[in-house]
Amino acid sequence: ITTQGGPNWLQIFANNGDGSFTDITQATGINLTKPAFSIAAGDYDLDGDLDLFFAHWLTDNTANPLEHLWQNQGDTSFIDDSQTLEIRTIKGTFLATDRSAEMEYSLTPIFADVNNDRYPDLLLTGDFNSSQLLINNSGVDFVDQTTDVFSDKAGMGAAVADYDNDGDLDWFVSAIGDPIANNLEFAAYSGNRLYKNQGMGHFVDATNEAGVRQAYWGWGSCFADFNNDGYQDLFVVNGYDGLSEEDSVRNIYTIFNENPAVLYVNNGDNTFTERATELGAIHTQMGRGLACFDYDRDGDQDMFIANSGAAPTILRNNHFAQGQHFLNIRLQGLTANPQAVGARVYITVADEQRMIELQLGNNYLSQNPVEAHFGVGLAQQVDSVRIEWPGLGGDITEMENVAIDQFLVIPHPDI
């Protein structure tokens, strides 16, 4: 799936299985009349196939507020089911016409089950204080449970993971927070946010406790265990070049031009320490999209960065996880959801449990591979693996005494 500017906002290509693709955009029935930014895929109605959500930044929601949530009909076609949720809008004015409208500023959607009821909820990161928590009401509709806790002013990217290993999913939002900009009178420059899940989808703002507020002009972000110690670390790419021709505005934006990426290493006590320069994760280009995965399959997580106006960057992790072990798990799902998106993978190591939920389209303008990479430290085996497959059928796969340092593929029980 690709999105772009111009009259054709969307293109969808089917993989033919032989290295070629076929354009099936028209057959899907998805006809966007406004530009789309990030895309998320998830089975929100738990009927076995993957549905889609499109974020539409800086678009007029007055005339046509739909085109967000597309329900898969099981035959490669989709219908617009956006009436089941309400997207927050902000009153704005088109400068060229002085026309006022209700503007949408959503940027990064993520399907994730934050209240542990198996139904994927929707975490929607938005600019200008428009981020939302939309709780899935058993596949019927979504209930807006956004509270004052969600205080990010300029949400751009997002990442979701269980960073404190307590069995539920937490939410990080990248935003704007340069030390110089914080001295300016701009309310939007208040930094990142980390929302810690206290259970059943009840969040608290743990940003200051965790020490992750500062990340310049943040975009793509990802949770990944870069040192294989069993705790999810956090990587964020930054940078912005002002587009305004007004000198006063452009001068403000130039402070973000060469902002470095930040690597927050999880200390295992609900706090993080920024160590990007120390560990060689140095990146000062205009980062946007980000994928964190083991691209060279050597047992540790690397970074692939899509840059604005420049070639991509690969940061290869060669030493940070040295001596620490891992277990990488991919799932083979059923035909309509072959990667088992929405499944939960649990492992137990020395009586400690860790969990990763498989997500698709979970980064700003990008996505990680659909796999679960666990660092297990110095452990010599994984005591148990438990797969909770997506859906309401209650399918479970369990394994014991699993060998470390391997890439494991686990098929669905019905395969």
Which functions belong to the PLM regions below?
Residues 8, 35-40, 65, 105, ...:
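Beta-rich catalytic cores
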Residues 47, 51, 117, 121, ...:
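Acidic carboxylate motifs that coordinate Ca2+ or other divalent cations, activating on Asp/Glu
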Residues 271-415:
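Gly/Ser/Thr/Pro-enriched helix-cap/hinge segments flanking short amphipathic alpha-helices
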